[in-house]
Amino acid sequence: MKVGAAVFELPGVVALEELSFSGRTPFPYVPGLFYLREGPFVTEALRRLSVVPDLVLVEGHGIAHPRRAGLASVVGLVTGRPTVGIAKGLLCGEVSWDSEDTGWVTLDGERVGLAYRCGRRTYYLSPGHLTDLETLLELMDLTDRRPHELVRRAHRLSRS
């Protein structure tokens, strides 16, 4: 498995540091237990960075997860860093669209995330660790409604 990490300064999306590394994972993919497979690699990537990020975006869910603790939540707990999850699919809950391209993800009557459309794709943001729904709105503002671009850059590093 190969993982990538990138640190940006916002606003302006200035790249400060990028890295990638690979290793073997002893765990198979198990739906809902993504952390067992990906978590150790994500936390190791964060450990290897020389720049300590103020906020970590994780490709995976935060509290918009059946256990209310997805990959972003667990990575935050393990590292002690504030995290936000960003995912391309909704694991649980439902979206109530406030506008054509933005809505809230609710689970058991509680807001647990933000959904937004960019082009034909829908993305789902949810607080992980030491963050809240307000953090999601601030992130949307700081990235011109494109936080997925930051995660995509790190994802590309894992594919190179």
Please report, for each region that a protein language model flagged, where it lies by residue.
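Glycine-rich loops and low-complexity Gly/Arg-rich segments
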Residues: 13-15, 29-33, 80-84, 109-110, ...
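Flexible, glycine/proline-enriched loop segments at strand-loop-helix junctions
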Residues: 29-33, 59-66, 121-127
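A contiguous pocket-lining binding segment that forms or flanks enzyme active sites
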Residues: 65-110
